[in-house]
Amino acid sequence: MDRGLSTGTHIGDDGLRERFQASQSDSSLGAGALTAAGEVEAKDGTSQNKKTFGRTPDGTVFTVPQTHDMVSQLLSPSEPKNLSDVIVLAILGAHILLLWWLPDFAKIPVFAVIYLFWRAAYNAGIGWLLHNQSHHKTLVRWAEKTRIFVNPSTNQNPHPKLYNLLKRELETKIPTDYSFEEAPIEYNTWLVFRRLVDLILMCDFTSYCLFAIACSHHPVGESMLMTVSRWSAGIVLVLFNLWVKLDAHRVVKDYAWYWGDFFYLIDQELTFDGVFEMAPHPMYSVGYAGYYGISLMAASYKVLFISIIAHAAQFAFLVFVENPHIDKTYNPPPPRKRMTEQDSVSTSSQATEPSVASASTDEPLPQATTPPSGPPPSVHNLLGFNNLDLYRITDTSSILIQLLVFALTVLTPSTPRYQFLFVANAAVWRLVFSVGIGYLLTEQSDCKAWTRHFLKYGETPNEAWNQWKGTYHLSMIMCYASFIAAVWKMYTLPADWGYGLVLLRHVLGAGLISLQIWTSASIYESLGEFGWFYGDFFFEGAHKLTYNGIYRFLNNPERVLGLAGVWGAVLITSSGAITFLALLSHILSLAFIQFVERPHMQKLYGRSLRQDAGLVKSLKRTLPPTLRQLHGSVDKIFDDSFEFIEELIDTARPKLAAGVNTFVKDTTALFQKYPARVTITRIDEDLAGLDSRDYALEIEGTDSSSLEERGDLKNLVFEYGSPIKVKWTAPLNHSKKDWVSLYRVTDNTSREVSRVSSQGRWVATNEGFYDNLTCEKGIITSDIVTENSEHRDVATGEVIFSGDKLFWTQGVFEFRYHHNGKHNVMAISRPFEIRIRRFDEESFEDNQASVEKSLLPVVRNCFDRDPEIAPETVEEQFGSLVERDGKFAKRVVFAVHQMFGIEFAPEVVRADGTVRNLAWRICNAKRVLAPYSMTRDGATTPTEAHEKDEAFTKARVTAMIRRRTRRDSKSAGRRESQLTIHENVVLRYRAWTPFKRIEYMEGSAKPGNSSHPLPVPIPRQAIQNERRGGKKALTQVRHNKQADADNADNNDVACLSRTPQPSSLERLPSSRGKKRA
């Protein structure tokens, strides 16, 4: 990649160091990863020479020859030159001549466009190639399809001249340990890709420097001291950038510099030194210091802004290209924990014990037998826009407070009086946030004062923890909201943006604010909710210190970088009051770390605390031995200041990744909601001679238990998420680029052409004819010659749709067979339905075992039946990939909602971790929601016959109650009271109809399968409405014979079950003659 100051080189090295870090964290894992990757190392016992061996994806082992960096290959006279070198040097020379030839007014815009073109070619072009190579092996497949590396002597290479040219070019560059004919295709493809990278990166850096030259000038009125300082700082940054690049290349060599692990894997010692110990992703962070040094020397805002654009584009390259490949290649999810025989025995013994889960709604998870010593699993996090929940009082209060502060800030004038009030308010809230919270944490650390307060009133430690998180969050919101309000009051728009350093101050201030946001995001990413809210002050346990993320390089990043934003506000406002607030904030934050955090950490972790961070160690190693002994405060301040610069980019990556990922997800959702429509108006010429009757599709899947038959055909209803096998039939001369896709029946109105994008839900019929591998996932067999019903030979094959190639919803779908990579439809399958069977609520008697039995196959389908993540039993833990990829939990949440009518958040599925825990949660939710299940749809909906029976019974009971009330009650108040009690019984009849049988006694009721007491209080308006309805029912009853009415008065009254029979009436003791309460 880039040498010297070039911008992009950093990627490969940086990403590789990140991978090494992940592997080095566990030596056994690292060794296993190397062994699994086939990385072999052979050393000569008599010399220091070491040969490197690589392994291709198909297992081929080969010797990786030694190569040289780009700059030395191009510019060193000792290195052999070839045609590609001449072309690159000629293009670079053309750039220089263009700068000399262009007139002055055209130099800046022309070279701005040229540089942006090469930057786009780097970040977008190379990024697209590497992304497809990582996911689909696109570059290697291109080489296989064109056969450019096949020896022409075999008569299989259609480009013999190109073959000879490539052979001469590559062997000239690598004179030893390399044979063009014997090298694997992956390595040769990588060598050709390197030449393209050399061209793009050299042109990228050269055009940037020429653009800076075109923009450079000497500011009018600048003093000599300022000029010397500007150039000195710029030269230092450029030299530092040069050292970063050279040291990075020394560590990772050309293999990672040119993204070699996208093509093959080699042996690589897990070294972690040099620049990679100073900063994360140094090629993306400090590796761009030279750009800002050149901006200083050019004294041009144009160069500064285009440098910022280039830097941001490089971070996007890291987020979308490097990091996904790193995670896929070097950080696969750990294997799922399998249940041992002892665990299964203990689990089964627990299952045989009497279950009391159905009798209590406050019981914890089934496995819990002792109070938890640690915090509850973080399911509903507090921080982040994604976790905003207006049903939660903390979130609602935070929004209302911010709206109130905003309204007061905007609606009040910016007079000195109001400015003083807002600054004083910000200072008070900073004192509350630092001193007040610090005092509470100190008391909690010493004597658990916060937890004891809640225990005194019968609450649990978990409740104390939740209340603490809300208190800390609200105080933090008020602290920063009041500070922003004070900044708003003290800020005035500049009259002239070009005057002095006004624009520079705003740019630097915005950069510092962004730095604090990135720092906070990185700290939260490393610590999580538990660490962010100081969870180790509240829960004691075997806590283990881990220095990952930003803490790998800094011990206390919030000490400097965490307050960068307040100093950015100082730069933007140039206000003494804001400077006072910034100093106050910084002093209080340092005091908080020194007097609150540090004592608790020393008490909790003792000698396991790290003394020096990675950056400090690296700086100490560069000092002479005499200076290494000095550990004064001056050294600390210097180290912390240097760490500030290092942490800038470290914290930038995760925040930028989160923001860009959110943007991509939103855009993807829009495209899915409004899919692009492709209209094909002409029929391909190669369709001539093909008969669509020779094509056919048959589908097989896991039948749902709710199959229906209509006429002679049985409706095709498949289980949610189950793989669907498609058998296709085509003529022997069918195109090898045919493909089968899955659509909703309503997606396409035409049966000749598919006009809607398949959105990735398609599988090719034959392997090796597309440039990606995703479309080949699912191919079982291809071009099996069989005889059809007309005794003609046809080609058949099978493909299977599973995972992301399915629709994870309910509906009616169809498969379509398309011709030659186009959208012409040759065959359409029978429509089939994907349905989630509704759980039978009549058999739902808090029977957790039945819920587990119904839920297990659904969960396995949602997890793609992958043995690494899908559980085999209800007790088995979910695989760790469920935690990483949220799509699996979302599938389960949708299925649970459709099956049981209970809506969970995806975090609940990840937190439960087993089918048994999830089933328990469903049962518990059903018990809690049982009193509110008076719906007119679903399994509990009464039929028309039931409603008639209910109306008849209700009328008889109401009439009897009114007669008793008139005879026995002597006052209107007592009549109304008694009527309320008995009408409660009548009104509650519908609520309990889902149960098998419900008996009602005087003034109380006890459902046969519910622990909820009845009657439930009913509003007076409902009683009045029922009273009016009772009068109508009474009128109907009066038409009956008086004898029947008297008989009903003396008889007991009972409520009927769902299918009432004459024998199902049970007698209640008559209330006549009894004393009424």
UniProtKB/Swiss-Prot annotation:
It catalyses: a 1,2-diacyl-sn-glycero-3-phosphoethanolamine + S-adenosyl-L-methionine = a 1,2-diacyl-sn-glycero-3-phospho-N-methylethanolamine + S-adenosyl-L-homocysteine + H(+). GO terms for cellular component: cortical endoplasmic reticulum; endoplasmic reticulum membrane; perinuclear endoplasmic reticulum. GO terms for molecular function: phosphatidylethanolamine N-methyltransferase activity. The chain crosses the membrane at residues 86-106, 110-130, 196-216, 224-244, 278-298, 301-321, 393-413, 420-440, 483-503, 507-527, 576-596. It is a multi-pass membrane protein. GO terms for biological process: methylation; phosphatidylcholine biosynthetic process. InterPro entries: Phopholipid_MeTrfase, Phosphatid-EA_MeTrfase_fun. Residues 107-109, 217-223, 299-300, 414-419, 504-506, 597-1077 are cytoplasmic. It comes from the Eukaryota. It holds the Pfam family PEMT. Its EC number is 2.1.1.17. It is found in: Endoplasmic reticulum membrane. Keywords: Endoplasmic reticulum, Lipid biosynthesis, Lipid metabolism, Membrane, Methyltransferase, Phospholipid biosynthesis, Phospholipid metabolism, S-adenosyl-L-methionine, Transferase, Transmembrane, Transmembrane helix. Residues 330-378, 1027-1077 are annotated as: Disordered. Gene3D superfamilies: 2.60.40.2840. Residues 1-85, 131-195, 245-277, 322-392, 441-482, 528-575 are lumenal. Coiled coil: none annotated. Its main location: endoplasmic reticulum. Pathway: Phospholipid metabolism; phosphatidylcholine biosynthesis. The keyword Nucleotide-binding does not apply. PROSITE patterns: SAM_CHO2 (PS51598). Residues 342-361 have a biased composition (Polar residues). Catalyzes the first step of the methylation pathway of phosphatidylcholine biosynthesis, the SAM-dependent methylation of phosphatidylethanolamine (PE) to phosphatidylmonomethylethanolamine (PMME). Belongs to the class VI-like SAM-binding methyltransferase superfamily. CHO2 family. PANTHER family: PHOSPHATIDYLETHANOLAMINE N-METHYLTRANSFERASE. This is Phosphatidylethanolamine N-methyltransferase.
